[in-house]
Amino acid sequence: MRPLPRVHAFTDAVLLAAPEFGIRAAAIAAGGPAVALHARARGSGGALLASGARRIMALARPPEAAVFVSGRPDLAAALVANGVQLGSDDLTPGDARRVFPHGWIGRSVHSVEEAKAAVDQGADFLVVGSVYDTPSHPERPAVGLSLVTKAAALGRPVIAIGGITPERAAEVRAAGAYGVAAIRALWLAPDPAAATLAMLSPWMGDA
């Protein structure tokens, strides 16, 4: 597998349907192999997710940004995506591996216990959050940087999510995160390309 990207740009159903989606996706994808675009459209049905994932594939390929699909290892396999990210209500990493054998498989976790279970089930990386309070999940209390550190000690790359901004990326890295994930800080930035590079900055020069 190619190296796991450091910056992960998650979509949602609103973003996938937005007229400017293609322009913003191309700007984020310009970050190249250190960037992954995640097709995610929870609650909207499979058609929007599939069409969005195909659009992302077309936009990401020239700069070689990675493409991940959320919750659908079957779609990830059909598109030959680089990875799949699983929520707590999705298949286990082990079951997803049977459908999607050749790419990265991540699992969203919100506690040390969930992180340990995901590792035991074969997750390649952990999406840990919400690290900070975030409008995306106002009902979910922030887990803080301590969970990032504890999850990283389990030996899997940790992607921190939830309230992540370029200004916070350095402290997240210092806590042990391999990389970060965001929605608003990337997709809704005045300059998505610049925001992506700023988010990536703490990891510049890392292998």
Enumerate the language-model features and the residues they cover.
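Conserved N-terminal beta1-alpha1 strand-loop-helix module at the mouth
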Residues: M1-L86, D90-P93, R98-D124, R140, ...
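A short, flexible beta-alpha/helix-coil linker loop
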Residues: Y132-T134
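A short local structural element in Rossmann-fold oxidoreductases
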Residues: H137
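Short, glycine/charged-rich "phosphate-handling" switch motifs in NTP-dependent
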Residues: Y178
